[in-house]
Amino acid sequence: MIIFNNLSITMKKRKISTYQLREKTGIDSKTIRRLKANENIETKTLNKLCTALNCKLEDIAEYVQD
């Protein structure tokens, strides 16, 4: 299972709010809610997040066994 708990941590480190992230990436509110609920998202969304936050995938996502 992929979880996105690290996303909030990375956002805090970079002092970026959810609103700013949405504006910077064009990701809608529904997708942000899906991220916070650890639901499936498209890889292009992950790419947008990593680009906007200037980070690696492991800075926003983590694999944990079910």
Which ranges hold each PLM region?
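A short, Lys/Arg-rich alpha-helix, primarily the initiator
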Residues: 1-20
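Hydrophobic micro-packing sites on short alpha-helices
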Residues: 48-50, 60-61
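Alpha-helical residues within the helix-turn-helix
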Residues: 12, 23, 51
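Short, charged recognition helix plus adjacent turn
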Residues: 9-10, 35, 61-66
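Recognition helix of helix-turn-helix/homeodomain-like DNA-binding domains
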Residues: 27-40
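Residues in the helix-turn-helix
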Residues: 20, 31, 59
